[in-house]
Amino acid sequence: MDKDFKIIDGELVEYYGNGGDLIIPDGVASIADEAFAENLSLTSVFVPASVSWIGDMAFRCCSNITGFRVDENNEFLCAIDGDLYAKDGTELINYAQGKNDTSFVIHEGVTYIRNVVFKYCENLERVSIPNTVKRIECAAFRGCTKLTRIEIPGSVEELVRWVFAECTALTEVRLNDGTRFIGEGAFASCTNLRDIYIPDSVENIFYDAFWACDKLTIHAHKGSYAEEYAKENNIPFEAIKP
């Protein structure tokens, strides 16, 4: 079975197999960045106790994986409802995109959501983000084409590049006090986005954060940075009553 893998000094860097239910070989210590990226033949993944680290975007856009399993003796990783987390529950590493679920609740205690965790996940209509989350990485929700509304807790200070780009069914976004920055293309090509509620804590918005959001109205307090941004970028503005 090891012939299906390229393993260098304990790191699994490439996969040559036929997919299906994948068992990572025991003894593998880490999985390289993008090792299985865009592999549509995988349907499930078992991670042995020996794996201590999974690289960035290791399972990016593996859209037919219905579940991850992790050896109960693994000291660094675990699976919760088929999704891959750090053992201490603070990091969401991979969402099993092959599930048919239309809603997902990120577990309380998660502080960090990795790059592209939900990218091009076409089933999700609703995602609940707890106020323990502090960082959502690049393109985490990009191309979630059925996602309709999202509320982002104020614990997330920065919305990074393309985090919700191409969410074409998204109609409403609510940010909460504490968020400070809306980054490059954060909501680009959200072509049905009609309303975003922006708190006074936001002090910087990248110029193309709402590129191709032609139906958008920005809701914020009068005199806020968000009002200034809306006027400078010819985006309709509606003042929130104090």
Residue spans for each PLM region:
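Structural signature of tandem-repeat unit edges
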Residues: 1-8, 16-30, 39-53, 63-90, ...
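Consensus positions within tandem repeat domains that build extended binding/scaffold surfaces
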Residues: 33-35, 56-58, 93-94, 115-117, ...
